[in-house]
């Protein structure tokens, strides 16, 4: 007797009108994560995962491409507004915000949450080239 085919349940994507975009811009890479209000991750993208390797990962264009890929991944959620939280001193800080704006999302606030040490760990030594 033949087995009945197993049907996969179609996941229903819930409508989330406003979300939070976390941008971690380091000197070597840019990580973009979009979460809902509770902090549940909806989508993420990196400059390295977007096809950029080596020193090209740390460019503003690579960060822009990562933000566009992340914005495209959450189109089905019906997001209208984004709150952007930026961490780090990297070159992809402004370009990710511009990419989100160009993707059609209304940005309600841009917050800089870069961690600043109050005389914490010793920084790495200066580069001599």
Swiss-Prot record:
Gene3D superfamilies: Ribosomal protein S11. Keywords: Ribonucleoprotein, Ribosomal protein, RNA-binding, rRNA-binding. GO terms for molecular function: rRNA binding; structural constituent of ribosome. One of its GO terms (biological process) is translation. It holds the Pfam family Ribosomal_S11. One of its GO terms (cellular component) is ribonucleoprotein complex. PROSITE patterns: RIBOSOMAL_S11. Part of the 30S ribosomal subunit. Interacts with proteins S7 and S18. Binds to IF-3. NCBIfam families: PRK05309.1 (NF003698), uS11_bact (TIGR03632). Belongs to the universal ribosomal protein uS11 family. This is Small ribosomal subunit protein uS11. It comes from Hamiltonella defensa subsp. Acyrthosiphon pisum (strain 5AT). The lineage of its organism: Bacteria, Pseudomonadati, Pseudomonadota, Gammaproteobacteria, Enterobacterales.
């Amino acid at each position: 007797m033949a087995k009945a085919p197993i049907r996969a349940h179609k996941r229903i994507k819930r409508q989330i009108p406003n979300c939070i975009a976390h941008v971690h811009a380091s000197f070597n890479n840019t990580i973009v994560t979009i979460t809902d209000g509770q902090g549940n991750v909806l989508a993420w993208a990196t400059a390295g995962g977007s096809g950029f390797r080596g020193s090209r990962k740390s460019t503003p264009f690579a960060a822009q491409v990562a933000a566009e890929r992340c914005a495209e991944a959450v189109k089905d959620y019906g997001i209208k507004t984004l709150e952007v939280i930026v961490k780090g001193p990297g070159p992809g800080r402004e370009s990710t915000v511009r990419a989100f704006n160009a993707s059609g999302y209304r940005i309600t606030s841009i917050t800089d949450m870069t961690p600043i040490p109050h005389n914490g760990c010793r920084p790495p030594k200066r580069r001599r080239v």
